[in-house]
Amino acid sequence: MLFRSVEVHDAEGLAAGMVSIAIGACWIGESMAHRRPQAGNVLLVELVEALRHGGFVLFDVQLSNPHLARFGCLEIDEAAYGRTLAQAVCRPASLRLQEGHLSSEAWMPQ
């Protein structure tokens, strides 16, 4: 089990961040905050892409909402969650985020 912090920075410092727990191929988002408009969205899009490429099979956001549904979030029933979680924690996965992957122009309001 690893506790992870994923962050988006701009010229003024931290723009958005998420504290998470990684267990095998399961990623559990615990807390997310943003200081700049849309920075949290950039974090989610980049993180989901990195999780997919790293072999993660479950990203538990804890609570679905219409905003997260725009990014592909879907609810699954308790039985499906249990099966997916049991498989995910036994699988290896890795997260490789590239520093400086996006320029601030990609998300800063114009």
Regions found by a protein language model. Give the residues of each.
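Short, small-residue-biased leader/transition segments that mark boundaries at the very start
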Residues: 1-2
